């Protein structure tokens, strides 16, 4: 008969967030089991990382180890860290252990799931690539997202990352009946708080009826120990998997920032006694990244589409952390400071953003040729800008002048009013279907709208709205 009594051990060594714990003979916990340590400030949860031999294990703490001392009692819970899942998590903020941290009381969840789970079996995967329509023109036309794919979001501070994220959360709920999970991994606490406040303001989180909210938030911020930052991504992913597998929904999983996940792993790695690899990163970098990324996928039941903010240290794309991330991405959305300065929002760079989905075999020749033509027009405009700056527009050939005029219209038509920004801008948000977006850009490229003023294309939804705006400008 299996004994149900939990084995207890004691702390023998403390090095920062890493603890060595001795257990009685034959009662060692398994790797990834959660351990509870009694400290003066309450209970600390740790996760077993290594079995050292000699009846000792090495574990990483999920919270601060200040005030701990050798000899403190440790209890093996007999299972990995488990977190609440389901609709009751919507509108709430959790920490890495799945405990609510928003002062709104406990979460009454019907079920919990362990954060370490295998990726879906190959037989359950959805193999046919399909486009995930976001309702945002520039994304759907030029760098479309794959349903169940992974998208890298690149952009500095203040170029509109947060607003873009909130718009995507809003659109997946309205157009796809889906929900979102936001994993804040090692970012600023202030930003986490701002995001929460903005979500309440734009009704992404419904304070009056939390279950009608469109997002669950999981935070492991910069001030947390590396153990929490290393695992908070898995906590968010586990909540997203429940919506996909049990509720059979389309889910958006945001990870901000995927670099901090790697960084936390490298902080812990040396303390666990592993030899560092290139640039001081952990030797298990690719394995850790793969274990997280392979669980983000489309199954026959539902999908998890993940949007990951990628910080590139010192703008070095060959750094092992971003380089390992790139291997998993299906699309990149690059936000440009130049476009933001011109007031073109979303400030997505149409020439730098890429997608593996933009192939005639997947999106169709109509979409593909329109996208390529839009890009080549914008590229030609970019090349001509130096000449225009020195000599002026009048010195260009007739053909180039026409290209510039159309490119400026395209640039403005790539902007769009967002639902979540209504509160700040006063102009109602627009969801533009892919079909309407393609139609609009084709009309501009064919020259059907050459006589319309370029201002008519700025911050509108579909092309009909631009034509109406031009008519009202005449009046």
Curated annotation (Swiss-Prot):
One annotated Gene Ontology cellular component of this protein: chloroplast thylakoid membrane
Catalysed reactions, as listed in the record: ATP + H2O + 4 H(+)(in) = ADP + phosphate + 5 H(+)(out)
Binding positions for ATP per the UniProt entry: 155-162
EC number: 7.1.2.2
Membrane topology per record: Peripheral membrane protein
Keywords from the named record: ATP synthesis, ATP-binding, CF(1), Chloroplast, Hydrogen ion transport, Ion transport, Membrane, Nucleotide-binding, Plastid, Thylakoid, Translocase, Transport
GO-annotated biological processes: proton motive force-driven mitochondrial ATP synthesis
Xref: Pfam families: ATP-synt_ab (PF00006), ATP-synt_ab_N (PF02874), ATP-synt_VA_C (PF22919)
Intrachain disulfide bonds: none
Protein's cellular compartments: Plastid, Chloroplast thylakoid membrane
EC category name: translocase
Molecular function as annotated in GO: ATP binding; ATP hydrolysis activity; proton-transporting ATP synthase activity, rotational mechanism
PROSITE patterns: ATPASE_ALPHA_BETA
Domain of life: Eukaryota
Known function: Produces ATP from ADP in the presence of a proton gradient across the membrane. The catalytic sites are hosted primarily by the beta subunits.
Oligomer status and interactors: F-type ATPases have 2 components, CF(1) - the catalytic core - and CF(0) - the membrane proton channel. CF(1) has five subunits: alpha(3), beta(3), gamma(1), delta(1), epsilon(1). CF(0) has four main subunits: a(1), b(1), b'(1) and c(9-12).
UniProt-listed PANTHER family: ATP SYNTHASE, ATP SYNTHASE SUBUNIT BETA, MITOCHONDRIAL
Recorded family membership: Belongs to the ATPase alpha/beta chains family.
Name recorded for this polypeptide: ATP synthase subunit beta, chloroplastic
Species this protein is from: Porphyra purpurea
């Amino acid at each position: 008969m299996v004994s149900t009594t939990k084995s207890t051990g004691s702390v023998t060594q403390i090095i920062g967030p890493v603890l060595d714990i001795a257990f009685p003979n034959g009662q060692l916990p398994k790797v990834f089991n959660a351990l509870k340590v009694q400290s003066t400030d309450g209970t600390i949860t740790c996760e077993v990382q290594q079995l050292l031999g000699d009846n000792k294990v090495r574990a990483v703490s999920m919270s601060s180890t200040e005030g701990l001392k050798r000899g403190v009692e440790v209890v093996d819970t007999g299972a990995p860290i488990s977190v609440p899942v389901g609709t009751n998590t919507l509108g709430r903020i959790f920490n890495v252990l799945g405990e609510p941290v928003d002062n709104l009381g406990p979460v009454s969840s019907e079920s919990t799931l362990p954060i370490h789970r295998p990726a879906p079996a190959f037989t359950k995967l959805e193999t046919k690539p399909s486009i995930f329509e976001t309702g945002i023109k520039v994304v759907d036309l030029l760098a479309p997202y794959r349903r169940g794919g992974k998208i890298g979001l690149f952009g500095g501070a203040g170029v509109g990352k947060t607003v873009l994220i909130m718009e995507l959360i809003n659109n997946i709920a309205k157009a796809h009946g889906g929900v979102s999970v936001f994993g804040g991994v090692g970012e600023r606490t202030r930003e986490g708080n701002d995001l929460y406040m903005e979500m309440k303001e734009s009704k992404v989180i419904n304070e009056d009826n939390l279950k009608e909210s469109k997002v669950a938030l999981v935070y492991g911020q910069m001030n947390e120990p590396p153990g929490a930052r290393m695992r908070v991504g898995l906590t968010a992913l586990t909540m997203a998997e429940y919506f996909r597998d049990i509720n059979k929904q389309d889910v958006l999983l945001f990870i901000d920032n995927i670099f901090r996940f790697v960084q936390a792993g490298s902080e812990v790695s040396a303390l666990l006694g592993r030899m560092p690899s290139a640039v001081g990163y952990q030797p298990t970098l690719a394995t850790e990244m793969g274990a997280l990324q392979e669980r983000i996928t489309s199954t026959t039941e539902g999908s998890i589409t993940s949007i990951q903010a990628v910080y590139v240290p010192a703008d070095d794309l060959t750094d092992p952390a971003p380089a390992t991330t790139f291997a998993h991405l299906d699309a990149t959305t690059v936000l440009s400071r130049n476009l933001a300065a011109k007031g073109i929002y979303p400030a997505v760079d149409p020439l730098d953003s890429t997608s593996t989905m933009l192939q005639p075999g997947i999106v169709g020749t109509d979409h593909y040729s329109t996208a390529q033509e839009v890009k080549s027009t914008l590229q030609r405009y970019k090349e001509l800008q130096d000449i225009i700056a020195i000599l002026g527009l009048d010195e260009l050939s007739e053909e180039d002048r026409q290209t510039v005029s159309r490119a400026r219209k395209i640039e403005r038509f790539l902007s769009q009013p967002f639902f979540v920004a209504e509160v700040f801008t006063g102009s109602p948000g627009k969801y533009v279907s892919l079909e309407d977006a393609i139609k609009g850009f084709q009309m501009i490229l064919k020259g059907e709208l050459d006589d319309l003023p370029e201002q008519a294309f700025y911050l509108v939804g579909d092309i009909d709205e631009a034509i109406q705006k031009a008519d009202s400008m005449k009046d």
